[in-house]
Amino acid sequence: METEYDDIEDRSEFLEEIEKEISRIKGEGIEVENYYSASCPEAIFRQIYEGYQSRVQKNHYLDFDDMVCYTYELFRARPDILAGWQKRFRYILIDEFQDINRLQYATIQMLAQPENNLFIVGDDDQSIYGFRGARPDIMLSFPKQYKSLERVTIGGNYRCTSQILRAATALIRHNKKRYDKKLLAMKGSGELVHVAMYQTPAAQAEAIAKKIQQAMEQGTPPEQIALLFRTARQMNIFSRKFMEYNIPFVMKDSIQNIFEHWVAKDVLSYM
């Protein structure tokens, strides 16, 4: 599609944002005519959305959100089919409930009736998929809809030291809509948490590469150093910087598109 967006620096990132918005529309049951895209003008977005839907239907495909949408529509249109599935699943357990969206929840509510034997597990402080339509407020309003429920709060944290947990709690406490909870770290105190801010990703990679190089010069083996990333895309700038500083490293990432991998990009740059 030839558009004014052909000169976008990172087309993959642009397409990922479009994909998230399509998922959000379906998960929230929004009509595309009433949706305003944050990635591109409405007319362009609708053209992309309609083209995507046309291709999916033409090839008899279903994406994940379609499976939820069609299930929801089927249950609403065919009470007899819904009744059959209600009898089959008398007890329902849902994990990561903080990431549920509106349509998924509406489908589950229908499926759980009339006994409403729902067991949900989640952490409202861990909801990070709002950009995909996740609605943590559903978990917060759950007790109002199911008044006879029993709530169990598990406060033991077996992953983090108390220093990490204390820093995280101090930050998340500013969220206005959350369940208040007391957490206890089971891994001891640990080292202090240091927070640093950088103007650009390049400046961040430069600073971290220098810190790692300094640690190695002081005798720290490289295999005792680790960097954690939220997405694989964030690793690319670090890999280039580590090679510049002759820092040995191993990347544990899943390759979805080989041509987006930094190794392939280096090869292509020579072609």
Stretches with model-predicted labels:
Residues M1-K20, A196:
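Conserved P-loop NTPase-based nucleic-acid remodeling module centered on helicase motor cores
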Residues D10, K26-I30, E115-N116, L171-K181:
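Proline-centered turn/helix-capping motifs that create local helix->coil transitions or kinks
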Residues F14-E28, Q163-L171:
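Structured, non-catalytic alpha/beta "coupling" segments that mediate domain-domain communication
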Residues S37-S141, G156-C160:
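Conserved helicase NTPase motor core
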Residues D124-D125, D253-N257:
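Short, acidic/turn-prone active-site loops that include or flank metal/cofactor-
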Residues K147-E150, G155-P248:
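Helicase P-loop NTPase motor core
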Residues M243-I247, I255-M271:
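Conserved short internal alpha-helix adjacent to the catalytic or cofactor-binding core
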